[in-house]
């Protein structure tokens, strides 16, 4: 989010939170949003050491400023990857990342019908999830995935869950696991 209402990820408080505090495993990170103060401790959940930080590379988080929620998942994905991107160490999911978590059973649904597939996603969504996708036509809003699975535009000063995303360097190897919630990947860094 951004206190001034901007929907530009690279200028947002979330960008600072993820790429400064979370990435560096800071013990205390504070910011203010709409006259409300927040303090976070990332010493146990952020990247704990340089070895871990060196396993992460700069990545391009693709997004689209599409406004047509009548498109299906593949159309959004193609538009996101043909459009602009932000470059950073840690980013947010884009709308198509979330929709791909439903598997192939929902791929032909339109973005505005994803609430029909919420139970099929492996991503937990209890309060709504921020995406990196800006939406320009409605006054600098940002797309979020609501807790019922709908993708819609909201003001960037609202509060929702953050799912940090990152790109690993090519030398990082999967040594165990299948990527499921019951058997997550174990990495050799």
Where are the model-predicted features located?
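Collagenous Gly-X-Y triple-helix signature in extracellular proteins
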Residues: 1-189
